């Protein structure tokens, strides 16, 4: 005759709850580093070190209206400021972008400028809202 401990079902339940909580916390935001903003869910980027690769930039709107999700808008970069690197080698550049309708937004571009270039004055960029204040920008090839 096998004797089954009474706590066995309770321990399985607790383990299951722990796994669910850990999975949901991890999947909500990809780990970005202690002093960096979290990378939004659904963005195919694991680290801010990758931001700007192949001319694709994840940007956070600092001033101006957030863009609608999945609606591309064209803009022209007007400036590039505040690009000093932090302890992790990441710059948090501020860029003003003039949109096709004449309005302007200011974004934060967190990236490693030694790996991927800053957005520059005159760059033509396609912007698409992701969620909240997050937008994805893709440079047009010159």
Predicted regions and their residues:
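N-terminal post-signal-peptidase region of extra-cytosolic proteins
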Residues: 81-83, 105-115
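Bacterial N-terminal signal peptides that target proteins for export
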Residues: 3-17
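Structural detector for short beta-strands of small beta-barrel domains
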Residues: 40-44, 55-91
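OB-fold (S1/OB) nucleic-acid-binding surfaces
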Residues: 86-105
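OB-fold/S1-family single-stranded nucleic acid-binding modules
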Residues: 131-142
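Short nucleic-acid-contacting surface segments enriched for D/E, G, S/T with interspersed K/R
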Residues: 112-128
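N-terminal intrinsically disordered, low-complexity, charge/repeat-rich segments that act as generic
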Residues: 2, 28-58
